[in-house]
From Swiss-Prot:
Protein name: Initiator protein NS1
Site features described as Cleavage, chain residue numbers: D227, S228, D285, S286
Gene Ontology cellular component annotations, sorted alphabetically: viral replication complex
Protein family per UniProt: Belongs to the parvoviruses initiator protein NS1 family.
Pfam families associated with the record: Amdo_NSP_1-3 (PF12475), Parvo_NS1 (PF01057), PV_NSP1 (PF12433)
GO biological process, one term: viral DNA genome replication
Domain SF3 helicase: 405-560
Organism field: Aleutian mink disease parvovirus (strain G)
Free-text function comment from the UniProt entry: Multifunctional protein which displays endonuclease and helicase activities required for initiating and directing viral DNA replication. Also plays a role in viral packaging and transactivation of several promoters. Binds site-specifically to 2-3 approximate tandem copies within the origins of replication (Ori), unwinds this hairpin region and nicks one DNA strand thereby initiating the rolling circle replication (RCR).
Notes concerning its domains: In the N-terminus, the endonuclease region is involved in binding to the origin of replication. In the middle, there are the ATPase and helicase activities. The C-terminus probably contains a transactivation domain.
Keyword Transcription regulation attributed: yes
Length: 590
């Protein structure tokens, strides 16, 4: 097994070295191909690709090769999407070939990388980046030449779309056809990456580092294997990229990031700066809503008009952002919410960040983001299942039996509240004298959840300081609620509540609550007056679990045991009440 792992590591290292030879460490240009919405012969919006008609044997060969490649790579592409890829990529390959020959370039020094994707908004598009790397050529001249190439490519595709558009709209007047072509040239399927120069007040082609763009941006996408998924369908560079698996892409991306980890967090690279293009058109399938580009629609003099609605610009995240996002994902996956958690579970990353400028601040920011993300996206039950490894639960079941509790019913009660399906009842109250296991169970649940906070009753002015953005809150040996009984009722009522915290902004409390107490907490003393006015509202928000039998567990119980036990729950919540006799073994005496 060890030898197989070594062989696999060597293979990936060789693959990484070979891929770096194919993708040069230099700058080129990048653009998107996007399907544009226009009107068909019935004045209805369409994204249909113009018919692929050509007398060029080279272009026909490119069409066939692209279709064969895409059909073999992914079965979730529609015929129209395949035709769009054939048209755009086929014209690109043919035009590159002509450009290389006319400029007498060495074709082996041309880098073209493309990737067909569907974004989170389900918009179909193709990423392309192109570079030419020859020591005998002036890089500035090469960039200008590549800029001219993109203009030519944009115009060629605009001509195809415009002619098709005019034909189906029966636009025959030369002047109207010229106007239509102008619109397609200005806002057609080709979208170069641009930046705005504040001095000249003009847009220029944005230089893109090919390796960074490929390894960091393109390789971060997952391959699409369902129709509703976002990610990439296929990718290629006429070499290794064509045949990489999703797992290999992720591994190579990590190797590239690790190679540059020395300056990855503070690199002076910001791809967002001035990145104002390409812009994605928010297109729908209804002729009565905002659709496509107004210039294209109006140029055809159709009855359908619309405003240009633009979504957010396509942005290329920086290395700094990618590294931070990678760290945040790792914290989420292993469950790190405090510096202590990170020291134990992600010690290398903690040490690396702590030695950087503003390192402690970065660490605290990432940990806070993970607290917010986890408490918002998943429940305490999900945390227990996600962050722990299963262990034999027999010692836990024996302890629960010794406490006089029915483990099957207790499991249903706990899971109903931990999944926040208990309605207004969002608090578990373990009640009983010392030595009965109430703190043992509460501590086990909180430690298994990992993202938990403690109610600091020692500071009555700010008891919730540690409770913001936690999946579960623990009030240990809770006595009198006093002046914060109203906050407690709001928090245990099942809603998200914001409360004041010491030295911080008001924080959102989203988690369920566990209380351990050997006194009757429904009797509240405010000042010198004890009152039962809050008793009924508190009972409506809590389920009381009486722990009356003294126990002496001889085996340590762990979060892994709790996961094994709770994971056998049938995922069906039950109706809860304040007192539930079904929780206890034998006849209740209270």
């Amino acid at each position: 097994m060890a030898q197989a792992q070594i062989d696999e590591q060597r293979r990936l290292q060789d693959l990484y070295v070979q891929l770096k030879k194919e993708i040069n460490d230099g700058e080129g240009v990048a653009w998107l191909f996007q399907q544009k919405t226009y009107t068909d012969k019935d004045n209805k919006p369409t994204k249909a690709t113009p018919p692929l008609r050509t007398t060029s044997s080279d272009l026909r060969l490119a069409f066939d090769s692209i279709e064969e490649n895409l059909t073999a790579s992914n079965e979730h592409l529609t015929n129209n999407e395949i035709n769009f890829c054939k048209l755009t990529l086929g014209k690109t390959l043919l035009l590159i070939d002509k450009h290389v020959k006319s400029h007498r370039w060495d074709s082996n020094k041309v880098n073209l990388i493309w990737q067909i994707e569907k974004g989170k908004t389900q918009q179909f598009h193709i990423h392309c980046c192109l570079g030419y790397f020859d020591k005998n050529e002036d890089p500035k001249d090469v960039q200008k030449s590549l800029g001219w190439f993109m203009k030519r490519l944009n115009k060629d595709l605009a001509v195809i779309y415009s002619n098709h558009h005019c034909d189906i709209q029966d636009i025959k007047d030369p002047e109207d056809r010229a106007k239509n072509l102008k619109v397609w040239i200005e806002d057609g399927p080709t979208k170069p990456y641009k930046y705005f120069n504040k001095q000249t007040k003009q847009d220029y082609n944005k230089p893109v580092h090919l390796r960074d763009y490929t390894f960091i941006y393109l390789f971060n996408k997952d391959k699409i294997n369902t129709d509703s998924m976002d990610g990439y369908f296929a990718a290629g560079n006429g070499g290794i990229v064509d045949n990489l698996t999703n797992k290999e892409r992720k591994t190579l991306r990590k190797m590239y990031l690790d190679e540059q980890s020395s300056d990855i967090m503070d690199a002076n690279i910001d791809w967002e700066d001035g990145q104002d293009a390409p812009k994605v058109t928010d297109q729908t399938d209804s002729a009565t809503t905002k659709t496509g580009t107004s210039l294209i629609w109006k140029s055809c003099a159709t009855k359908v008009t619309s405003k240009k609605e633009v979504a957010n610009p396509v942005q290329q995240p920086s290395k700094k952002l990618y590294s931070a996002q990678s760290t945040l994902d790792a914290l989420f996956n292993v469950g790190c919410f405090t510096p202590e958690d990170m020291i134990i579970k992600q010690s290398d990353k903690y040490l690396e960040l702590s030695l950087e400028p503003n390192g402690p601040q970065k660490i605290n920011t990432l940990l806070h983001m993970n607290q917010v993300k986890t408490s918002t996206m998943i429940t305490a039950f999900d945390c227990i299942i996600k962050f722990n490894e299963e262990e034999d639960d027999k010692p836990l079941l024996a302890t629960i039996k010794d406490m006089g509790l029915n483990e099957q019913y207790l499991k249903k009660v706990l899971c109903t509240i931990l999944t926040k399906q208990g309605g207004k009842r969002g608090c578990i109250w373990f009640y009983g004298p010392g030595g009965t296991g109430k703190t043992l169970l509460a501590s086990l649940i909180c430690k298994a959840t990992v993202n938990y906070g403690m109610v600091t009753t020692s500071n009555p002015n700010f008891p919730w300081t540690d409770c913001g953005n936690r999946n579960i809150i623990w009030a240990e040996e809770c006595g009198n609620f006093g002046n914060w009984v109203e906050d407690f009722k709001a928090i245990t009522g099942g809603g998200d509540v914001k409360v004041d915290t010491k030295n911080k902004q008001p924080q959102s409390i989203k988690g369920c609550v566990i209380v351990t107490s050997n006194t009757n907490i429904t009797k509240v003393t405010v000042g010198c007056v004890e009152t039962n006015a809050h008793a009924e509202p508190l009972k409506q928000r809590m389920i009381k679990i009486r722990c009356m039998k003294t126990i002496n567990p001889k085996t340590k119980i762990t979060p892994g045991m709790l996961k094994r036990w709770l994971n056998t729950w049938d995922r069906q919540p039950i109706q809860l009440s304040h007192e539930m006799p079904e929780l206890y073994l034998g006849k209740c005496r209270w």
